[in-house]
Amino acid sequence: WRAEYYKRRAQAIQNRIDHDLYKGSLVKRGSGTLVMTGNNSYTGGTTVEDGGLFGFSESFGSGTVNVNGGVFGILSSFDDNFTQKGLLNSLVGVARAPMQKANVVVNNGGTYAIVADQNVQVGSLTFNPGSHVAVISLTGNAFEKAYRGEDQVGTVTADSVKGFNENALVTPDYALVNHTVTLDGNTLTGVLSKGDKTLADYAANSNGVSVAKALSADPALLGALADATKDEVRKTLSSLANDIHVTANAMTVANGQSLARAIKDQAMGIDGAARVSDVDGGRARLWVSGLSNWSKMDRSGASKLKSDFYTGLIGLEADINANNKVGVFFGAGKTKFKGGHDGKIDSNDLHFGIYGQSKFEPVRLDYGFAYTHQDRDTNSSVFFKDQIFRASPSYNAKVAQIFGEAAYTGLNFGSVSIEPYAGLAWMHLSTDDFSNDIGGVKVSTKFESQNLAVSSLGARVKVPFEVGPAKLKAVADVNWTQYMGDTRGKAKLQSGALNAKIRSEKLSAVAAVGVGLEAQLSKRAALGVSYYGAYGGKIKSNGVGATFKLAF
């Protein structure tokens, strides 16, 4: 019975074939592009929902082509490099016998593509409300030629054209070439011509201009962007000009000042030198300190970069004599740099250094050396035209600084003392280079080292008081800090002929205020807490700290 069933089934199929009962249809889905070059006779119609569908006018059977989404276009010729058939040509207008021509209806969300350098014929061509028309190039070189000043023209001649003037919107908005489509009789003519804009015109800031000029100097990269839209060029420039790394370097310098301040504060005590005199017994002291600092720094044409800086420190100090002491410290923590859509950097930090204090009444000197090592992991994206690439480099940054401060301790008004001071620091920051693979192209970021001088002028006011048996001291601190030297983070973006300079905003003057409170817990123990806020034209920060000290 099975043999009989299959025999009858085969006969039924053959009968439908012999009497042309199979209609057949084509539905194009998915983001890819399909090119058809055969002379097809299916009658069930063609529907385009997504991606691209191109072919000869005779390739789409006798049914209607409905373009509901994606892009559809007719070709007069096609160089078949995929199946190695070479140059193929449409039979419409060439063959002696009349050939069927595609009847096309472009609906809301669909795009009809006029292919530059090709002149084609269709049956009817209808544009419904919400439809689009574009001039494109399947090879891409038409846009390069247009940008060089060679107009690129394509035409579509139809038996009838409906709804073009009323409904069709010419898209997309190309960045570097002008894009026009006109209707004359039943012929649509699309033209690509050189525009009056350059890549630099779409840059949001000086970093973007630098990237744009570098891209324009590389024929291959410029050619790749010749058919980019305005939004794609803006995204490309903004992405490649991302200053999150160099801004992180500038903020690391500012965080280094917070670290030095924490060391000096614990050395003298937030309340002055009271820890040495009030904490009895022993000339050596073990201390632990926690520091948190939250900062924001401006970025040209982008959202601010936020920095969350957390550090724990442990140190040991000893008196050399009544007027001199030295100490060492070690610490670890994290810094989180957050740049919104431009990405983030997570850093594991290590700190160590030495410090000292000397008194030459009525002058006190505080000085030291600090070194910070950052192990940074990045999570960001790079846009190039209509593509997106993940960029997650890991690299190291190092900061070394020598700092010193001279304070005058002779202004006492009863129990209240005023302590004017001046400070100076030298800082050196270096950062490892890294590279990203962007679509198979190696793009390197090479950092410039920074050498800075940091000066500060300020005054502290100290007021001791008692609450029951507890001894406390309150401190207020105001100062003005000035950064000098290499105050911008700088790097070079390099790949082939691409060589663009990326810079952060400038660290300049900062006004700061601090308040602190210290409590004597016992003869050997003291606890201090503090707040510090710094406010500059480009950077603002707020921080809190706590220090516990034990003499032995």
Regions found by a protein language model. Give the residues of each.
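Acidic/polar low-complexity surface segments
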Residues: 1-19, 23-25, 74-94, 384-386, ...
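Solvent-exposed flexible segments
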Residues: 406, 410, 418, 423-429
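Outer-membrane translocation/initiation segment of Type V secreted surface proteins
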Residues: 1-15, 22, 138-312
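Outer membrane beta-barrel transmembrane domains
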Residues: 326, 353, 357, 412, ...
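Outer membrane beta-barrel translocator domains of Type V secretion systems
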Residues: 222-413, 528-532, 536-539, 543, ...
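Extracellular beta-strand/loop-rich repeat segments of large surface/secreted proteins
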Residues: 58-154, 158-160
